Amino acid sequence: MKIIKNATAGTVESSDIMITVQPIESTENTIELESSVEKQFGNQIRQVITTTLEHLDVQGVAVKAIDKGALDCTIKARMITVLHRGAEKETYDWKELDSWNV
């Protein structure tokens, strides 16, 4: 999936995460995380973000996440949404997404 524009999903309310993506001039992805629970769960949050990027074959994107205690399922849902918005895709491959739940 190719990200072609900046996009945002989520909120900064309690138990949520706001994720912003923007295309960059690189094949590498960058992740900037701001979280009140970063010391405890920062690695796990980054892992969920990275795994979602890999599943959707996204390269060359800068991800900024402002976490307020979101669960993994919320992070994954916000990532899927923001990436589809950034790629201007209006449909989801539900079978593909469901195959992640092994």
Curated annotation (Swiss-Prot):
Subunit text: Oligomer with a subunit composition of (alpha,beta,gamma)6.
Q: Which GO terms describe its cellular component?
A: cytoplasm
Q: What is its main location?
A: cytoplasm
Question: Which segments of the protein form a coiled coil according to its record?
Answer: none
Residues carrying O-(phosphoribosyl dephospho-coenzyme A)serine: S14
Pfam family example for this protein?
Answer: ACP
Keyword entries, A-Z: Cytoplasm, Phosphoprotein
InterPro entries (UniProt xref):
CitD, Mal_deCO2ase/Cit_lyase_ACP
- This one is known as Citrate lyase acyl carrier protein
Query: What family does the entry list?
Result: Belongs to the CitD family.
Give the UniProt subcellular location, in the record's own words: Cytoplasm
- Briefly state the protein's biological role: Covalent carrier of the coenzyme of citrate lyase.
